[in-house]
Curated annotation (Swiss-Prot):
Its EC number is 2.7.7.80, 2.8.1.11. The modification Phosphothreonine is found at residue 59. This is Adenylyltransferase and sulfurtransferase MOCS3. Disulfide bonds: none annotated. It is found in: Cytoplasm, Cytosol.
Length: 452
């Protein structure tokens, strides 16, 4: 009787596994279809607004211009001709975050006649420490629109067009041609490749900036005869688990302000023909020591897939598929573990409430652990997991294969990396991560638990 029950259980289990696999396959197909429809919808929504109307061509400065821009007009290498070039120029800024805000602010203030602002996101409180065009009163509205409001307060003569939708392979080729210089102020790899390929195909200078923690980088791609493009330097995108954005790694607001202001300066230099443009070189900023380094980077790659004389890429592709990550700076949820190696926060909460013996490892850095932590969590930074220094510390718990170990992090990504590594050493142990991490805990278990 017991054997029959066991056989029935296995048969039912196999049926459920097959059903789950079928549903997952159907879900994946629907997800792909949804993505295609969303891209098409974005394209249709953008068609009526992407084209920059014919610009007014100015031949002289007004009295207001002379008064407003007098401090740069008297620069010997800039003068009236430089100001006229700025007044007749159009610059596209992709991303109105920590980099895009200062860049837009300085370009509008300097008298750039036309600005395009691209950002799909809305203002939220966590933006305000570094995204200086936005305010508390504008939380919840489009970042592009919020930036437009602030910029027109600075300079009402600047013509500003907002694109409050995600830049993609469809609308990029409609938006970008109308602009003279493109600023990459995004915070994700997929958009970097998208902008690079579009600018290379359309022969538009691309001023690229990045900032993370206390470090920043700046260069100009697709400029001049021998200037490299982004693909010349990075032909292959990094694996998703190796990518850290400011939402995960943090950033000091003054660092993004520094790099964003320098992006504006490089754009002005390109437009005016001022000084030596930062092409073929990269500026590296170390905020912790306040040091700048200027290093030479490789020239145009003869066999580059997009900017060589015989390119393999002549149109835009699916960059989320190419990079294996989303074209935004939101949570990029990794999928490194099998479902049975994960536990949802509700099930873990029940287990913890029932006081069942277990070990909860929090793999966030100590600075994040200090902000908040789950009850009974032990802080073991991911680096200590990866170098196996945790083994001796928890030798007693690891002796028993039955003693359950759970791993948690902020969003459920680092915890997967930790579990994956621990399972290589202890394959028979019960080691699982808390799915979606502390963000899920706040959402599903305790809404008063801090989220950051």
């Amino acid at each position: 009787m017991i054997a029959a029950t066991a056989d029935s259980f296995e048969i039912e289990k196999a049926k459920l596994c097959r059903k789950i696999a079928e549903l997952q396959a159907a879900l994946n197909a629907k997800d792909q279809k949804l993505r295609e429809l969303q891209l098409a919808a974005d394209n249709l929504l953008a068609e009526g607004e992407v084209q920059l109307a014919p610009r007014d061509h100015y031949t002289e400065l007004s009295n207001d211009d002379i008064a407003r821009y007098s401090r740069q007009l008297i620069l010997t290498d800039f003068g009236v001709s430089g100001q006229m070039k700025l007044k007749n120029s159009a610059v596209l800024i992709v991303g109105l975050g920590g980099l895009g805000c200062p860049a837009a602010q300085y370009l509008a203030s300097a008298g750039c006649g036309n600005l395009g602002l691209v950002d799909y996101d809305e203002v939220e409180p966590s933006n305000l420490h570094r995204q200086t065009l936005h305010t508390v009163s504008r939380c919840g509205i489009s970042k592009a629109e919020s930036a437009r409001i602030a910029l027109l307060e600075l300079n009402p003569h600047c013509r500003i067009i907002c694109y409050s939708n995600l830049l993609n392979s469809f609308n990029a080729m409609q938006i970008i041609p109308a602009y003279d210089v493109i600023l990459d102020c995004s915070d994700n790899v997929a958009t970097r490749y998208l902008l690079n390929d579009a600018c290379s195909i359309l022969q538009k200078p691309l001023v690229s900036g990045s900032a993370l923690k206390m470090d920043g980088q700046l260069t100009v791609y697709c400029y001049g005869e021998n200037g490299p493009c982004y693909r010349c330097i990075y032909p292959v995108p990094p694996p998703p688990e190796a990518v850290t954005n400011c939402g995960d790694g943090g950033v000091l607001g003054a660092v993004t302000g520094t790099i964003g202001a320098l992006q504006a300066m490089e754009a002005i230099k390109v437009i005016v023909g001022l000084g030596e443009v930062l092409a073929g070189r990269m500026l590296i900023f170390d905020g912790s020591s306040c040091q700048f380094r200027n290093i030479k980077i490789r020239g145009k790659r003869p066999n580059c897939h997009v900017c060589s004389s015989q390119p393999l890429i002549t149109g835009l592709i699916d960059y989320e598929l190419f990079c294996g990550m989303n074209a935004n700076d939101k949570d990029n949820a990794l999928q490194l573990l099998e479902p049975e190696q994960r536990i949802n926060v509700l099930d873990y909460h029940k287990l913890a409430t029932e006081k069942k013996s277990h070990l909860l490892l929090d793999v966030r850095p100590p600075a994040e652990f200090e902000i908040c932590q789950l009850p009974d969590a032990v802080n073991v930074p991911l680096a200590q997991i990866l170098d196996d220094s945790y083994v001796q510390r928890f030798a007693q718990q690891l002796e028993s294969k039955e003693y359950p170990i759970f791993v948690v992090c902020r969003r459920g990504n680092d915890s997967q990396i930790a579990v994956q590594h621990m399972k290589t050493r202890f394959p028979d142990h019960s080691i699982r991560d808390l799915e979606d991490g502390m963000h899920a805990w706040t959402k599903l278990v305790d809404q008063n638990f801090p989220i950051y």
